[in-house]
Amino acid sequence: TPSRSGSYSISYLTIKSAFEAQTQTINGVEFETSPAFDQFKENIDVISGRLSNSLEASGISDRYDTISQDILVPAFLAAYTGENAENASMGVFPRIPIPNWRIDFAGLSKLPGLKDVFSSVNLTHGYRSIFNVNNYTNSLLYTEKMTLDNQLTDYPLASLTDSITGKLVPVYILNQVSILEQFAPLIGINIKTKTNLSASFNYKRDRNLALNLSNAQVTETQNSGVTFDFGWTKADLLLPFKT
């Protein structure tokens, strides 16, 4: 019996939701909330409705469970990419890689007032976002089109049901999907003076999103950090040590 399993990664773009955290006060206590997560919950009904329409158009009378991965994953991706769930992709495996970037600008040292003091002034900014399906395997109910020449991105609608629940079973079974987003750095400044003093400042930020499909739970962790470095270069410096 043919089967298929593996993992899937693709460069992505989630910058629209990167700075959306808000605060809410309940009984005098301030909590941080996530507009993207609230949107994810709203998207579930939208995606469920779109899938029902697609199933009806295909002549399939059965329905997905509300927390089926075929509903949750598109709702999750639409929320954290800032797309409208009404017209967002319904695929579980995004098809097109989105370019990430790194920008380095070294022109400030040529400006009047700076070029007499600094030999170099560099600004840096980098962005990286990766969508991961940590592990997938085909449902044992499906044996057709499991060969490698069938693209994962051509994700089909479910057509077979679970004998116990009566709900549609997805063609591929996923345990978890995640998004790793990094600003490395969000802003970085590196300078060197004419007197060989050097300094650098970097503000980095990252976010890790995970959707656990066994319990429909979303976890989000964020980290940020600031680094400073200073240095001085001196030619022909004599150290007071004997060798």
Regions of interest found by a model, annotated:
Residues T1-T243:
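Exposed, low-structure sequence patches enriched in small/polar residues
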